[in-house]
């Protein structure tokens, strides 16, 4: 069994890959692309007898990376024999603060399980490439047994090749004075390009979680540029909003938050989001039976959830990173482990065919359940009242307006941007 590493700058050319041409990506790479790989691979021809580790001569392994220069017989380990097939996970924005928390959760087995080996494929930019090398070094020094491969690069057509999961965190932050329409266009270009790359080289059943904001519309752009991947496989992260809502309900009810279930965030990841207390439960009872303060539920609860990020910035001096990473891990775990009986989770998904009457062809956060196979179904046993529906329609209108802003990126003609008010969440300005 071989344990190897490659660290090789490569040159290539910048051009978008045509849709539907999966293996043409070799000709469509950014100029001066960089790719480095730290890999643990099975090589029966190089197995070491008796499980003894041996180092290869430096002269024959000039490109190796630290501990990955050493070879091991991994078949000598009983737990290795029972491991599942390796899962390839791409992470964009991999040199950022969110990724700095997330990657170690992934590598530890906390997210996919203690019998699931993984390969991490980290996407950055020329500007962040040295930082990516530092991230790879920290992962190396952490000695995670399930982490079998680490590669870093700036070309999505290389980094996304054969990935089973794509966690798209990287996006341009909103600068001072930048209109929301401009942010939609700038980040939309990023996610259009990444959608094309996923369509060209990723696994055709890849699961895609969009974190970079505005995440709902970015997810829509991404899926529209990846027609060979099921639209159902694309998600926009609203799990942090759900986690915040659970915390506030638990605080008000005087219980620990593990007693709170069936919390839904409906709509956009913006201040039009709708934390649903009508269907939520505390210790199995409807929230409205436990918390009888209707005014608090309708006003303070919703506003507190929407503005939690801003409150954190005031205290901490920067936007949330660790809690966002936790929510990404939670979102993945909700798809790879069966949903507890009677419960559900929130995620932004494609609305076409939804049972609620929400406009089709947008990405909208809704309640979902999973059997633990990476797929999901929409929960149907939900209640609606006028208060909830009115707010859902407001968030729907916002997403329809955003969709018009990016029509040039989704193949639907010329863009027309008329977002009536600025609803970006605190920390995104």
Swiss-Prot record:
Residue span of the annotated presequence: 1-40
Chief location: plastid
Residues noted as binding NADP(+) in the record, renumbered to the chain: 93-99, 187, 194, 211-213
Keyword tags: Chloroplast, Disulfide bond, NADP, Oxidoreductase, Plastid, Transit peptide
Molecular function per GO: L-malate dehydrogenase (NADP+) activity
Enzyme Commission numbers on file: 1.1.1.82
Disulfide bonds: 64-69, 405-417
Localisation: Plastid, Chloroplast
Catalytic activity: (S)-malate + NADP(+) = oxaloacetate + NADPH + H(+)
Gene Ontology CC entries for this record: chloroplast
Domain of life assignment: Eukaryota
PROSITE patterns referenced in this protein's UniProt entry, alphabetically: MDH
Pfam families, sorted: Ldh_1_C, Ldh_1_N
UniProt feature coiled coil, ranges: none
GO biological process: malate metabolic process
InterPro entries membership: Lactate/malate_DH_C (IPR022383), Lactate/malate_DH_N (IPR001236), Lactate_DH/Glyco_Ohase_4_C (IPR015955), Malate_DH_AS (IPR001252), Malate_DH_NADP-dep_pln (IPR011273), Malate_DH_type2 (IPR010945), NAD(P)-bd_dom_sf (IPR036291)
Activity regulation, free text: Chloroplast NADP-MDH is activated upon illumination. In order to be enzymatically active, disulfide bridges on the protein must be reduced by thioredoxin which receives electrons from ferredoxin and the electron transport system of photosynthesis.
Residues the UniProt record annotates as site (Activation of NADP-MDH): 64, 69
Subunit composition and interactions: Homodimer.
Summary of the function given for this chain in its UniProt record: The chloroplastic, NADP-dependent form is essential for the photosynthesis C4 cycle, which allows plants to circumvent the problem of photorespiration. In C4 plants, NADP-MDH activity acts to convert oxaloacetate to malate in chloroplasts of mesophyll cells for transport to the bundle sheath cells.
Entry similarity comment: Belongs to the LDH/MDH superfamily. MDH type 2 family.
The protein, known as: Malate dehydrogenase [NADP] 1, chloroplastic
């Amino acid at each position: 069994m071989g344990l190897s590493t490659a660290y090789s700058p490569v040159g290539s050319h910048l051009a978008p890959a045509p849709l539907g041409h999966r293996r043409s990506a070799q000709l469509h790479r950014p100029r001066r692309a960089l790719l480095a790989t730290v890999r643990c691979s099975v090589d029966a021809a190089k197995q070491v007898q008796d499980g003894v580790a041996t180092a290869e001569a430096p002269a024959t392994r000039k490109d190796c990376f630290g501990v990955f220069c050493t070879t091991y017989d991994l078949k000598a380990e009983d737990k290795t024999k029972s491991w599942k097939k390796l899962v390839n996970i791409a992470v964009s924005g991999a040199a950022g603060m969110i990724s700095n928390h997330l990657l170690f959760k992934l590598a530890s087995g906390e997210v996919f399980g203690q019998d699931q080996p993984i390969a991490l494929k980290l996407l950055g930019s020329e500007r962040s490439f040295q930082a990516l090398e530092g991230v790879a070094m920290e992962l190396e020094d952490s000695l995670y047994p399930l982490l079998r491969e680490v590669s870093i690069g700036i070309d999505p057509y290389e980094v996304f090749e054969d990935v089973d999961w794509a966690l798209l965190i990287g996006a341009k932050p909103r600068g001072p004075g930048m209109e929301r329409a401009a942010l939609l266009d700038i980040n939309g270009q990023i996610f259009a390009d990444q959608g094309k790359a996923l369509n060209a080289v990723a696994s055709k059943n890849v699961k895609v979680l969009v974190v970079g904001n505005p995440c709902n519309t970015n997810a829509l752009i991404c899926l529209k540029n990846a027609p060979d991947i099921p639209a159902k496989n694309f998600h926009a992260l609203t799990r942090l909003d759900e986690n915040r809502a659970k915390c506030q309900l638990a605080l008000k009810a005087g219980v620990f938050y593990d007693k709170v279930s069936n919390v839904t965030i409906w709509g956009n990841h913006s201040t039009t989001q709708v934390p649903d207390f009508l269907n939520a439960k505390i210790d199995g009872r409807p929230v409205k039976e436990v918390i009888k303060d209707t005014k608090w539920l309708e006003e303070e609860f919703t506003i507190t959830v929407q503005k939690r990020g801003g409150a954190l910035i005031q205290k901490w001096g920067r936007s949330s990173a660790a809690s966002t990473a936790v929510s990404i891990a939670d979102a993945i775990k909700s798809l790879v482990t069966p949903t507890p009986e009677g419960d559900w989770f929130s995620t932004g998904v494609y609305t076409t065919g939804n049972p609620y009457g929400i406009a089709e062809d947008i990405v909208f956060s809704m309640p979902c359940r999973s059997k633990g196979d990476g797929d999901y179904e929409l929960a149907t046993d939900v209640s609606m009242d006028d208060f909830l529906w009115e707010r859902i329609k407001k968030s729907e209108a916002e997403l329809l307006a955003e969709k018009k802003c990016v029509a040039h990126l989704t193949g639907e003609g010329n863009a027309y941007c008329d977002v009536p008010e600025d609803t970006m969440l605190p920390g995104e300005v």
